[in-house]
Amino acid sequence: MSEVSSAPVRRPFHRRRKTCPFSGANAPRIDYKDVRLLQRYISERGKIVPSRITAVSQKKQRELAQAIKRARFLGLLPYVVA
């Protein structure tokens, strides 16, 4: 006969989703000239950090990526940090 362990079953940990830092009343605007804001969403190697890490909404992530690319094109941000 097989005996089943009667250990309590643990539910998987569910992390609460963070809110988007660009939504809300006094949220900062995404602007390609605001280099200090854009640098918070770029890794130390110069890559754009994904929204699952920064908790930015899908719409704002696209705006953020476009602003970072514009700033790179104008020479305000580096493409790659060596």
Curated annotation (Swiss-Prot):
UniProt keyword annotation of Ribonucleoprotein present: yes
Recorded GO MF terms: small ribosomal subunit rRNA binding; structural constituent of ribosome
One GO BP annotation of this record: translation
Keyword check for Transferase: no
Coiled-coil annotated spans: none
Pfam family, one: Ribosomal_S18
Taxonomy, superkingdom: Bacteria
Oligomeric form and interacting partners: Part of the 30S ribosomal subunit. Forms a tight heterodimer with protein bS6.
Protein known as: Small ribosomal subunit protein bS18
Gene name in the database record: rpsR
